[in-house]
Amino acid sequence: MAVEKTNASSSLVEVIDRILDKGVCIDAWARVSLVGIELLAIEARVVVASVDTFLKYAEAVGLTTTATAMHA
């Protein structure tokens, strides 16, 4: 995947449109510990994309066939 670089500024609408078109995956992990004792651990995976983009990539990796087989 090539990264496109432009010098022009983008409006918020253009940025949101691009995120929904391409999709964004955010993987975050945090741990809070005190004196070597883990107090809190947070793991999050967030995917932001349009339904059309999700279905296109889900079909490419075979996720849609599993869902169809479950409902049949």
Swiss-Prot record:
Keyword annotations of the record: Gas vesicle
InterPro entries: Gas-vesicle_GvpA-like, Gas_vesicle_GvpA, GvpA, GvpA-like_CS
NADP keyword on record: no
Superkingdom: Bacteria
An annotated Gene Ontology molecular function: structural molecule activity
One Pfam match: Gas_vesicle
A single cellular component GO annotation: gas vesicle shell
PROSITE patterns linked: GAS_VESICLE_A_2
Main location: other
Subcellular location(s) of the protein: Gas vesicle shell
Biological role: Gas vesicles are hollow, gas filled proteinaceous nanostructures found in some microorganisms. During planktonic growth they allow positioning of the organism at a favorable depth for light or nutrient acquisition. GvpA forms the protein shell.
Family: Belongs to the gas vesicle GvpA family.
Cited NCBIfam families: PRK09371.1
Subunit annotation: The gas vesicle shell is 2 nm thick and consists of a single layer of this protein. It forms helical ribs nearly perpendicular to the long axis of the vesicle.
PANTHER family: GAS VESICLE PROTEIN A1, GAS VESICLE STRUCTURAL PROTEIN 2-RELATED
Protein name: Gas vesicle protein A
Gene: gvpA
